[in-house]
Amino acid sequence: LRGEVDASLLSRANALGWQGKTPVSVIVGNRPEDDISRATEAMRRYAKHAQLDVMAGVVGQRLVAIVGGTHDPMGAARHFANVYAPGPVIAGHIVDSLDQCHFSAQAALSGFDSANAWPGAPRPVSSNDLLPERALGGDDAARELLISKIFKPLVETGGELIETIDALVTYGGIEPASRALFVHANTVRYRMRKITELSDYSPMEPRELFVLNIALSIGRLGERH
């Protein structure tokens, strides 16, 4: 989980039944209060049924599972969710192999630490869906993703899309935003579609508008002189 992977560590993983299936992701949640071995055995049973690799263990008060062989970490997390104690369950993004799993682990652990900032978050939730909360909590990787995936593509188109997001956040709807921008409401709708095409986030959805707003704020902070 710290990125300290060498041949001996991979050998020990193999001894625990890790077969080297890829891609790999990490799932994090609260450890159950009862027998941990019962929880990890339940994970192993599901993994065997689904033809996945899994290694699980306790880190502090968290139960961390490394899952190999799935392109759908959220699907695996949904199957594992009942094993965890109440609280957030975070599925990290997929990586190519076990020696890169620390990237997924860092994202999942960061998401776990910041999930309380989104009271309505689903359970489980992807670490990528917690980018704003992770960024606000000081996660540099999340900040960089918001800048590279949202802020920069929008800035590169000029100022119209940025000012449209600002107006939607400030005035709370298409009609009031169009009046503030002195444009027709259909122009705002067209810009909203362009925003979605460029960023994969729709300003029509309140949660996604929040993500866009945080991305703009973080990007602007990075441009301070």
Regions found by a protein language model. Give the residues of each.
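Cytosolic nucleotide-utilizing catalytic cores of signal-transduction proteins
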Residues: 1-225
